[in-house]
Curated annotation (Swiss-Prot):
Belongs to the PPR family. P subfamily. Residues 1-86 form a transit peptide. It holds the Pfam family PPR_2. SUPFAM superfamilies: TPR-like. This is Pentatricopeptide repeat-containing protein At2g20710, mitochondrial. It comes from the Eukaryota. GO terms for molecular function: mRNA binding. It comes from Arabidopsis thaliana (Mouse-ear cress). PPR repeats lie at residues 138-172, 173-207, 208-243, 244-274, 280-310, 314-344, 349-379, 384-421. It is found in: Mitochondrion. Keywords: Mitochondrion, Repeat, Transit peptide. InterPro entries: Pentatricopeptide_rpt (IPR002885), TPR-like_helical_dom_sf (IPR011990), TPR_rpt (IPR019734). PANTHER family: OS10G0501000 PROTEIN, OS12G0527900 PROTEIN. GO terms for cellular component: mitochondrion.
Length: 490
């Protein structure tokens, strides 16, 4: 995919409007009926098949003589990103650049960088970043690159970008600090969390509610209840900080992890009381998950009923309630929710069937998991790497390694650039094939991985040594040039 950079930094232009007739022909077109509910954004929202081109929807809209505003495209990209439809969002971003009547702002370029990383991988995002002139690499662009590395937990590169931002004077606010704080928590670097917080104090960078909630989350991860409680008391006493529902939800999560259910429920109730109308949808999604972790099914269903009464009923709600029920190992209730989703929800979201597949796999119900996969492939025409990898892991947990190898091979065959194989599945399959003396099967797996650029010979040796497995068989294959030698990815 070509990612065209159009940094036409000129005087501000109006919010451009485009008709297909202006681009491709001069004949008259018949505008679509004046249906207020038939908008381009609604058409895009209904076209949820990730394997289909979203540009066809846009072309169809233009062919009917309709208008396309730059602001509308921005709204559509925002919506697609919100629902993790990154490939479709990138297609529209590319389309905006290719049709020069649409002004491309520096913010658009930063969003493009983020989308390229999500769709094509960090390597493609880095190439795109290098095409941008030095004088145009602003705070937003560096911030987007920092987010790309942080989201993939590439710590050393994120730290490099953070240092560059510091040298360029881009650390005036707390946002970059929050990104790094969150990354340190996710990578278990808790001493760096304290160090960075002290740096914020030294540089007089005022923390915000996200800073507070990230620190509370760090306490909950390590089950430091005493530290969490003391920190919360200090925050409550700080008149300059306005705590929100998430503050008490994160505190509740800390209590849940420590097994202090009653204290957790007290915090969850306090969190609910602080939810305002604008945040209600997202808050209920989070709180359902926490109530599920606390084993309170009746509270999950209470919030689910409230959630369904809200305007704008989204797939994220189904994801939250299904996740909550799975935490309580209630697969029968999950199946009922799935039936409700299939019957009344038209927007396809692969994350929802993926949750059911995972639930079946954890319970060893592999036939049912296969049924869901067959529906995805046959009805929705969707073959996703993650789908097959979930099946492979399920068969591995069930001790059916022959089936695990079969499903994982299919995952590799449908994989896209940027995919990183699940190490547990990878090493289990290699170990199994080695134990079976299946040299040909092992060669095919390694060849597929190498051809698609997912793993190198050196990386495979590194992973195998870390897992305590034999490396001689892979070493022999490396010498036979079945896999390409590359730098080890750690």
């Amino acid at each position: 995919m070509k990612h065209l950079l159009l940094l036409r930094l000129v005087l501000p232009k109006p919010n451009y409007i485009l008709r297909r007739s202006f681009l491709f022909h001069s004949g008259k077109t018949t505008p679509s009926p004046l249906d207020p509910y038939d908008t381009l954004q609604r058409r895009v929202a209904r076209s949820g098949d990730p394997s289909a081109s979203i540009i066809k929807v846009l072309d169809g809209w233009l062919d009917q003589g309709n208008l396309v505003k730059t602001s509308e495209l921005h709204s559509i990209i925002k919506m697609l990103r919100k629902f993790s439809r990154f490939s479709h969002a990138l297609q529209i971003s590319d389309w905006m650049s290719e049709h020069r009547v649409h002004e491309i702002s520096e913010g658009d370029v930063a969003i493009r960088l983020d989308l390229i990383a999500k769709v094509g991988g960090l390597g493609e995002a880095e190439k795109f970043f290098e095409t941008i002139p030095m004088e145009r690499r602003n705070y937003h662009l560096y911030g987007a690159l920092l987010n790309c590395y942080a989201s993939k937990k590439v710590l050393h590169k994120a730290e490099q970008v953070f240092q560059e931002m510091k040298e360029l004077g881009f650390l005036k606010g707390c946002l970059p600090y929050n990104v790094m704080l969150n990354l340190y928590v996710r990578t278990g670097k808790y001493t760096m969390v304290e160090k960075l917080l002290r740096e914020m104090e030294d540089e007089t960078v005022k923390p915000d509610i996200f800073t507070v909630n990230t620190r509370l989350h760090a306490y909950s991860v390590v089950s430091d209840v005493e530290g969490m409680e003391k920190f919360l008391m200090r925050c409550e006493a700080d008149q300059g900080l306005h705590l929100d529902w998430r503050t008490y939800a994160d505190t509740a999560n800390g209590y849940i992890k420590a097994g202090l259910t009653e204290k957790a429920l007290e915090m969850l109730r306090k969190s609910e009381q602080m939810v305002n109308a604008q945040k209600r949808k997202h808050a209920y999604e989070v709180l359902m998950s926490f109530y599920g972790a606390a084993g309170k099914k009746e509270e999950v269903y209470r919030l689910w009923s409230l959630y369904k009464e809200l305007d704008g009923f989204y797939n994220t709600g189904y994801i939250s309630v299904i996740s909550a029920l799975l935490k309580m190992d209630d697969i029968e209730e999950v199946e009922k929710i799935m039936e409700e989703w299939e019957a009344g929800h038209s927007l396809f979201d692969i994350r929802i069937p993926h949750l059911l597949i995972t639930g079946y796999c954890k319970k060893g119900m592999m036939e049912k998991a296969e049924e869901v996969v067959n529906i995805l492939v046959q009805k929705w025409r969707v073959e996703d790497t993650s789908t097959w990898e979930r099946l492979a892991l399920g068969y591995k947990m069930a001790g059916k390694m022959e089936k695990a190898v079969e499903k994982w091979k299919r995952a590799i065959e449908v994989s896209k650039p940027g995919w990183r194989p699940h190490q547990v599945v990878l090493m289990s399959c290699v170990d199994y094939l080695e134990g079976q003396r299946d040299m040909e099967g092992l060669r095919k797996i390694l060849r597929l991985l190498s051809e698609r650029g997912h793993i190198s010979y050196d990386q495979l040796l590194y992973d195998m040594n870390g897992a305590g497995l034999s490396w001689k068989i892979v070493d022999a294959m490396g010498k036979g040039r079945y896999v390409e030698e590359r730098e080890v990815r750690i």
